[in-house]
């Protein structure tokens, strides 16, 4: 098995060092924005009064919608440079959406015996995110006219 750093080395060499650094910068820049948006949503929407983390749900649903909007744009022939795609989809949307926090919240609900809340969380996040991605694609079609 090849060591992970050797895979990175081969990737750098294949893309050319300049292209790789631009890609890393694009993903990193988008991730900084996406992670801060997710954090802000949590501060704004989460409270200790209820067991549902509305900030996490809002992050996943809005990220799904944004990915759908971007995919709709690309499917209609819209073009961004590869670096802008990495910034928007991999960086921003990838850091905005959060499978790990969602998973932790579901497992915590299960451990507390709140099975209906766990199932509701799974349905809201998974079905909701898929629905919002489809809605994002549809939204782009409506906006494009």
Which role does the model predict for each range below?
Residues 2-145:
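Membrane-interface helix-loop junctions in multi-pass transporters/channels
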């Amino acid at each position: 098995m090849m060591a992970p750093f050797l895979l990175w080395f081969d990737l750098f060499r294949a893309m050319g060092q300049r292209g790789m650094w631009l890609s890393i910068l694009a993903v990193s820049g988008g991730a900084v924005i996406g992670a801060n948006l997710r954090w802000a949503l949590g501060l704004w929407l989460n409270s200790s009064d209820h067991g549902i983390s509305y900030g996490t749900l809002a992050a996943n649903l809005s990220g799904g919608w944004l990915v759908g909007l971007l995919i709709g744009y690309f499917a209609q022939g819209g073009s961004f440079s590869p670096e802008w795609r990495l910034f928007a989809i991999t960086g921003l949307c990838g850091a905005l959406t959060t499978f790990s926090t969602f998973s932790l919240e579901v497992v915590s609900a299960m451990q507390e015996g709140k099975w209906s809340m766990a199932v509701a969380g799974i349905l809201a996040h998974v079905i909701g995110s898929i629905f919002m991605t489809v809605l994002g694609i549809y939204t782009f079609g409506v906006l494009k006219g």
